[in-house]
Structure formats: structure tokens, C-alpha cells
Amino acid sequence: DEAGRPVLSGAVGYISVSHTDGYALLAYSLSNPVGVDMEHVDRNVSAAARRFLNESCLSAVPASERDIYMLASWCACEALFKLVGNIGGTYKDNVIVKPFLSGTHGTIDVSINGISPTYDCDLEAMYVNDGELFMLLVEAK
């Protein structure tokens, strides 16, 4: 489409695609727009964190959980971009990833800080961490 997102030509539904070193991830939803991202669990995103991570959220995360929180936040920003397109501001100031208890799978509270009037909807973020890959799906509800 005009925002660079993949579309299903002549078909019903929404798709999103991600890839990283030897892996690919495809999400399909019949009814709701989706965005996905995946990264290797051992990827160090701390150097880039200052560009995409809200400092107040990071400070609320225990030190032992910060690496996975930073990776989840990175994946959430990437997935949101694939879902929404240009949010009209910076991720650091406008994407909120609330601290969460990490495990092998679960949900994460993700929100866009009111700057995308065309995307004033509920977002649901689900993740899987298989020990090698961290995969995150954001769906508009």
C-alpha cells in the first residue's frame, strides 16, 4: 500500500512479514491489521535503545530483565511501524511498552501515545520467546 505495507491482492485479510538471519515470520489475520517482528534473543539493542526506548519505562524494569525488555521494545516498535506506518513522531516519545514479566510467551501492554489519529484503537501484543528467537505480533482490535 502507500505506506509500504504488504497487501493481499484480490484476497481478504491482512499480512505482515519479518525476517532475521535464516528465519522468516509471516502473520495473517482475516479481520484485523497486524504487524510482526522477530529478532535473535542474543541481539544487543542497548546501543540503539536511546533512540526508541522511553526512559521512564526502562527505569521501572529490574536490571535482570532489561535486556529482554529492550529487545521486546525494539520488536514492538518495528511491529507497530509495520502495522500503522509512520506514527508522526518518535518512537521514544510516543510508543509505550509497559514493563512485563518475561517468559516463554505472553502478552505485553503496548500503546501509541495518541499521535496517530487514524489509529485510535486498542492494540494487543503477544510474544513468544523460544530461547533463540523473540517474536512479537501486534494486532489492531
Residue ranges and their predicted role:
Residues 1-141:
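Core catalytic alpha/beta fold that binds nucleotide/phospho-ligands
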